[in-house]
């Protein structure tokens, strides 16, 4: 069990580095904390359209329903990891831009501490930001200008959850979240006529 926890910790560390390098290339990520990602951590939950609160099974980690951890066998160790791929096309009446991005998506693990107490932990991206836009304008005072807006980075979210079985068919659970990361924005103004 100790080897499994060590392996999962190492994978989580490398996963955090992969999150920081994710590049979404979406103009929608300009606003707020960026483009908020799907909260469903498990691929089975995403495949069902994000239905997660009702899912309650011992063979998967459902971070959106922490009481579901109580269904995990007390001798089991669950490890789940995923990858993310997205292909997008952005177009206007005369321009089109394609972008494809792949990144490490999430890592989570769950295990039983006692027959009535189960624990889960994991990390996943909360939001991503990646855009580069240029705006050309002409002003009578200075002439032609080009403004470049660029943003990169995002926020990650780690969680630690516990579930307690308090009856044959009743369980309660709660998660604690920690959100961290950075978003870098840059605005550059060029004066092409001033050369």
Regions found by a protein language model. Give the residues of each.
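Sec/Tat signal peptide C-region and signal peptidase I cleavage site
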Residues: 14-20
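Sec-dependent N-terminal signal peptides
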Residues: 4-14
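Subset of outer-membrane beta-barrel
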Residues: 21-195
